[in-house]
């Protein structure tokens, strides 16, 4: 059954969109709107292929004049990111490394954006920051050594200087994490500090002294991990202090601390699962935060908790079976605006604080960021046929129903052809409804058959939905002449928690059944799919599934692409960094339950591999170590299976550098063209 209206496609005369054009697109992010709703700030990242990096700039849009072009702020020339408005809307703060010493510091400018003035002059990089509502201070994060007492900053600078002159490169570790994501531990922790900016000359105040945890959390945390109260008297933050059990723990808690320093208080000690993203209501009377229920399970449902001034905690919309991604208080404090995955889309919802009533405010696509204004919403939204764009909603109703496009960024896309797409559904494992998307090739001709790229998402608790990606983008395949099929198998997010839970300890059976049934349904329903010319591709869990398919479902595939996939499940159980993930997903440790790791271990079936496979892995991938890719490639070579190994020495679990991404796509499409050739 079809569950989505077929999306429009550019005219047949338009040139197909290609991966080369995708990698050169300007990328919008970082939405910030002033308190009056007059101006919107956003970041645009251009790609400099010669320098092999992205170059970011701040842009300003006057929301009162939607048809007037946005303008680039002059201060961007020195490098500018993470812009925030002062509460009065007169000053723009941002991070830049333009000053003496090259450290990242907070700077400011006025609305003209012509001249930058340095605000902080710290000897350490500022990692994240917030402006106190009274504008007398900032709260910033700095990487310091937690064992430092007294002046943490000076002590850290001294220890770093001592390390710099040490001619030995050896590092002794006495606990894990020894490395995380793509970085080896150096003994520092992200800590919060109050920095006076009122001219008083007050020294920085440590807000988390001695805390053996990171605020913001590593590796991806930002200023969403802490919040300053409207009266500028307190700071709430989320952190995890777990000692030697840190890699096994998801027990993040919400703390409060006076902004002037003093003891910090754990407000969520009773919950041993994940508490995150503190947000205080405009009247300062209610703390909202996200919370999970099950310790050790990172993909549990995030629900909203409300804590009043008396310490009473209630769950908001307890029966709403969606997991909260981002959220913010409404201007009047009567509602929370929530972003959550929902059946292949990432939508904005409003939840009434008094009743828990949930109302959908967007209809499709992927809401990337939003901000409520007096007249509606400013938001960033992407889709399967559009990168993130800045929009202004019309008053009332659904925000993405005929919104106003506020920028001319990537205007050339209107002249390119994209593949039309639609969502479908079928009965998968346990006769439960499973959804997927099919994308036609750009320039599709009725009656013609096309080779198929069968894309398998990672996570595994993730989704290949109606949103844009610069790494796994189905439109890059459509532009190269391939049709695309993507299945949100059991374990995917946005379909309820039970659906998400179904994959744990079942990596190789329930999702595989969904993929097999989804493939059969797609072939039966869409005659333009050429089932005799098909390839399966995936990354992370998708890479695991490709390795698993190589020994369990070979028939449909002329070739395979495995990016950062698990090859040996037992080895993965010891070499990955976030142990809570492995032990939850496998149902125990390698010590206690080795048979569970072997139940879906691709290595044990490598003797049966025969389908040509391209293996891709990177040296800085500490989530799924490069040895997994080397192992898969070695097995293929030992069996005499046509194979290739693409290695990046300077990438992590994701391939991000422009030239490397270009190489990735060129290699992958060369592999596909060899075996199922769209050209």
Which sequence ranges carry the predicted segments?
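Short beta-strand element of the alpha/beta-hydrolase
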Residues: 448-458
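Non-catalytic accessory segments flanking enzyme active sites
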Residues: 32, 139-141, 165-197, 201-207, ...
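Active-site-proximal cap/loop segments of hydrolase catalytic domains
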Residues: 473, 478-479, 486-679
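Short loop/turn segments that connect beta-strands within beta-propeller blades
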Residues: 63-66, 110-114, 197-200, 258-262, ...
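Residue-level detector of Asp-centered blade-edge/turn motifs that repeat once per structural unit
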Residues: 35-36, 87-88, 133-134, 230-231, ...
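A flexible loop/linker signature enriched in serine peptidases of the S9 family
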Residues: 44-57, 73-81, 95-107, 121-127, ...
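Hydrophobic beta-strand positions that form the internal "hydrophobic ladder"
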Residues: 40, 89-92, 138, 235, ...
């Amino acid at each position: 059954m079809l569950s989505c209206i077929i999306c429009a496609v550019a005219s047949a005369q338009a040139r197909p969109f290609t991966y080369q054009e995708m990698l050169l697109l300007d990328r919008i992010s970082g939405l910030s709107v002033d308190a009056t709703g007059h101006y919107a700030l956003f970041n645009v990242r251009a790609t400099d292929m010669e320098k092999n990096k992205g170059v970011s700039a701040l842009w300003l849009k006057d929301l009162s004049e939607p048809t007037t072009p946005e303008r680039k702020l002059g201060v961007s020339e020195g490098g500018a990111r993470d812009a925030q408005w002062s509460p009065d809307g007169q000053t723009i703060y941002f991070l830049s490394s333009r000053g003496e010493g090259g450290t990242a510091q907070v700077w400011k400018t006025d609305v003209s954006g012509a001249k930058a003035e340095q605000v902080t002059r710290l000897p350490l990089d500022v990692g994240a920051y917030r402006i106190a509502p009274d504008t007398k201070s900032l709260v910033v994060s700095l990487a310091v050594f937690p064992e430092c007492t007294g002046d943490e900053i000076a002590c850290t600078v001294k220890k770093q200087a001592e390390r710099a002159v040490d001619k030995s490169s050896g590092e002794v570790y006495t606990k894990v994490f020894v490395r995380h994501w793509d970085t080896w531990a150096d003994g520092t922790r992200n800590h919060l500090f109050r920095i006076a900016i009122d001219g008083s000359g007050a020294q920085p105040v440590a807000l988390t002294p001695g805390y053996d945890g990171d605020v913001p959390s590593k590796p991806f945390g930002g200023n969403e991990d802490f919040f300053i109260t409207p009266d500028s008297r307190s700071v709430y933050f989320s952190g995890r202090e777990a000692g030697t059990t840190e890699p096994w723990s998801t027990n993040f808690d919400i703390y409060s601390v006076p902004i002037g320093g003093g003891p910090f208080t754990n407000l969520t000690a009773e919950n041993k699962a994940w508490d995150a993203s503190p947000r205080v209501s405009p009247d300062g009377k209610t703390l909202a935060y996200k919370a999970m229920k099950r310790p050790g399970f990172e993909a549990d449902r995030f629900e909203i908790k409300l804590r009043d001034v008396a310490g009473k905690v209630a769950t908001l919309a307890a029966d709403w079976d969606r997991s909260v991604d981002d959220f913010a208080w409404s201007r009047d404090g009567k509602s929370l605006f929530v972003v959550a995955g929902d059946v292949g889309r990432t939508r904005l919802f409003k939840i009434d604080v008094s009743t828990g009533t949930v109302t959908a405010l967007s209809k499709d696509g992927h809401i990337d960021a939003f901000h409520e204004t007096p007249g509606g919403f400013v938001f960033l939204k992407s889709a399967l046929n559009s990168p993130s764009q800045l929009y202004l909603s019309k008053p009332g109703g659904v925000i993405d129903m005929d919104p106003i496009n506020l920028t001319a960024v990537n205007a050339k896309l209107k002249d390119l052809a994209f593949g039309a797409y639609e969502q479908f559904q079928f009965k998968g494992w346990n006769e439960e409804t499973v959804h997927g998307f099919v994308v036609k090739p750009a320039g599709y001709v009725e009656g013609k058959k096309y080779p198929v790229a069968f894309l398998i998402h990672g996570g595994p608790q993730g989704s290949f939905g109606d949103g844009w990606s610069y790494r796994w983008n189905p439109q890059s395949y459509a532009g190269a002449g391939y049709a695309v099929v993507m299945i949100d198998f059991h374990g995917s997010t946005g379909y309820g928690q039970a659906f998400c839970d179904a994959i744990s300890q079942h990596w190789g059976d329930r999702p595989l059944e969904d993929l097999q049934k989804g493939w059969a349904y797609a072939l039966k329903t869409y005659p333009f799919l050429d089932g005799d010319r098909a390839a399966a591709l995936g990354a992370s869990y998708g890479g695991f599934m490709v390795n698993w398919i190589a020994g369990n479902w070979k028939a449909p595939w002329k070739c395979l692409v495995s990016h950062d996939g698990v090859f040996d499940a037992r080895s993965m159980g010891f070499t990955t960094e976030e142990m809570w993930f492995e032990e939850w997903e496998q149902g125990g440790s390698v010590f206690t339950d080795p048979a569970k790791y072997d139940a879906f271990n691709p290595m044990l079936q490598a003797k049966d591999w025969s389908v040509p496979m391209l293996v891709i892995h990177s040296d800085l991938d500490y989530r799924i170590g490069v040895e997994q890719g080397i192992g898969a490639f070695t097995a293929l070579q030992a069996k005499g299976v046509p194979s290739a190994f693409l290695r990046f020495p300077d990438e992590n679990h994701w391939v991000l550098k422009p030239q490397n991404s270009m190489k990735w796509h060129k290699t992958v499409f060369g592999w596909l063209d060899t075996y199922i050739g769209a050209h």
